[in-house]
Amino acid sequence: MNPKSSTPKIPRPKNAFILFRQHYHRILIDEWTAQGVEIPHNSNISKIIGTKWKGLQPEDKAHWENLAEKEKLEHERKYPEYKYKPVRKSKKKQLLLKEIEQQQQQQQKEQQQQKQSQPQLQQPFNNNIVLMKRAHSLSPSSSVSSSNSYQFQLNNDLKRLPIPSVNTSNYMVSRSLSGLPLTHDKTARDLPQLSSQLNSIPYYSAPHDPSTRHHYLNVAQAQPRANSTPQLPFISSIINNSSQTPVTTTTTSTTTATSSPGKFSSSPNSSVLENNRLNSINNSNQYLPPPLLPSLQDFQLDQYQQLKQMGPTYIVKPLSHTRNNLLSTTTPTHHHIPHIPNQNIPLHQIINSSNTEVTAKTSLVSPK
């Protein structure tokens, strides 16, 4: 029975294959039951009968076609108003989609009715709860985990800060050496931002009083660097001149001031031109900031990187006062090459006083 119409559904008239299938289906089941064979599924039985139908002779098929014609005439006599109206699959799908859409619309209407039926006074209260939850999630917590996460985020933000490279004429450290191209120039204004490479250093603002200005200069010169560690021996401290006798002490990373107030020994990273400018300070017009105390470590870091690229063997020559020919590219003389395992070593182990050139082989350790 069709629920939309009260009239029963009229079956279609049987064709030749359906009549043939009904006939042989009964025969096969009777044979299998007599033999005690398990009866297969109807789909398999239809395949067996289909192969037999294709293998029939045209004369045998004509018999079943005649039976189908008689079946059709009998069907017309019983149902004279019958007309075959096939329903396409697309229409079936469309009907299913329409039914699904109708069900969804009904559910939405029911939900809207339920929301409207609720009292409207509860809405501001619920909104306040949501705002309180958000504020609680954004408030700083006193737990250790939240403080650690905040510190970690702060450290990452500090690491992402750019290191400025200002190339000005005011107290700029000249670091260009022949045969040793260095990476960048720094000014005294840039040093407080180099926390990843340098230790804490004093930085003073420019006072207007000349007496306090000299006081700051003397304090900055005499103050040693905190937490200083032994670094790679500076090459200029190993060999001064070929005529001089070797000294058995090494240079450390600290910078000391001389007794004279007008002259003081700056770090090896500063040039001779800078030392000349130190001697010609005018109290009324110019002010010189404190010397760059950690510049030795910077220079040794760049020196280590350059020596690492050149290889484990390098040549040291006597240096002039201008520090221009730091490394030599000449062919080394064939002498015994001692090995330097540590940083602080006696100089008589590596210096050959009879020659002007000294070849040394060292295991470099990166300065911290």
Swiss-Prot record:
Subcellular location: Nucleus
Zinc in keyword set: no
Biased composition (Low complexity): 102-121
Region of interest (Disordered), residue spans: 100-121, 242-273
Xref: InterPro entries: HMG_box_dom, HMG_box_dom_sf, SRY-related_HMG-box_TF-like
Function: Transcription factor that represses the expression of HEM13, COX5B, ANB1, CYC7 or AAC3 (hypoxic function). Binds to the DNA sequence 5'-RRRTAACAAGAG-3'.
CDD domains xref list: HMG-box_ROX1-like
Taxon lineage: Eukaryota, Fungi, Dikarya, Ascomycota, Saccharomycotina
GO biological process terms on file: cell differentiation; cellular response to increased oxygen levels; cellular response to osmotic stress; cellular response to salt stress; negative regulation of transcription by RNA polymerase II; positive regulation of transcription by RNA polymerase II
Name of the featured protein: Repressor ROX1
Gene Ontology molecular function: cis-regulatory region sequence-specific DNA binding; DNA binding, bending; DNA-binding transcription activator activity, RNA polymerase II-specific; DNA-binding transcription repressor activity, RNA polymerase II-specific; RNA polymerase II cis-regulatory region sequence-specific DNA binding; sequence-specific DNA binding; transcription corepressor activity
UniProt xrefs under PANTHER family: SEX-DETERMINING REGION Y PROTEIN (PTHR10270:SF161), SOX TRANSCRIPTION FACTOR (PTHR10270)
Residue ranges: DNA binding: 10-83
Induction of its expression: By heme.
Gene giving rise to this polypeptide: ROX1
Main location: nucleus
SUPFAM superfamilies cross-referenced by the UniProt entry: HMG-box
Additional information: Present with 238 molecules/cell in log phase SD medium.
Superkingdom of the source species: Eukaryota
Gene Ontology cellular-component annotations: chromatin; nucleus
Species assigned in the record: Saccharomyces cerevisiae (strain ATCC 204508 / S288c)
Alphabetic keyword roster: DNA-binding, Nucleus, Repressor, Transcription, Transcription regulation
